[in-house]
């Protein structure tokens, strides 16, 4: 049960939908910078996590909140690996432009 003055499930779902929409717009409109693309993908994952926590709290089940910890762990590893690859790519090519990445050579 939620106390008076606390946000409802709908408020959390609207927040999650807004964050997800911003992330989708960031992925589709950004065609230049890989770092912004990675940030938009992380925003998508954050929106999903907010929805999982909201439903978990609403239903009184902790499974969604525990699952969020696993998602955050995978997202942190993905971001670390992505940034490491990006740093190595920048050292070789001196660019982080998305258009330049499609040409990989051995």
From Swiss-Prot:
It is an enzyme of class 7 (translocase). It catalyses: a quinone + NADH + 5 H(+)(in) = a quinol + NAD(+) + 4 H(+)(out). The keyword Transferase does not apply. Its main location: membrane. Pfam families: Oxidored_q2. InterPro entries: NADH_UbQ_OxRdtase_chain4L/K, NUOK/Mnh_C1-like. This is NADH-quinone oxidoreductase subunit K. It comes from Acidithiobacillus ferrooxidans (strain ATCC 53993 / BNL-5-31). The gene is nuoK.
């Amino acid at each position: 049960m939620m106390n008076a003055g606390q946000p409802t499930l709908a408020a959390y779902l609207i927040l999650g939908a807004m964050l997800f929409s911003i992330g989708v717009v960031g992925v589709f409109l950004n065609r230049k910078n890989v770092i912004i693309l990675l940030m938009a993908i992380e925003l998508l994952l954050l929106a999903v996590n907010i929805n999982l926590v909201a439903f978990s709290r609403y239903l009184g089940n902790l499974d969604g909140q525990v699952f969020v910890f696993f998602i955050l762990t995978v997202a942190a590893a993905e971001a670390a690996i992505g940034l490491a690859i990006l740093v190595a790519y920048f050292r070789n090519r001196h660019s982080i432009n998305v258009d330049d990445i499609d040409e990989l050579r051995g």
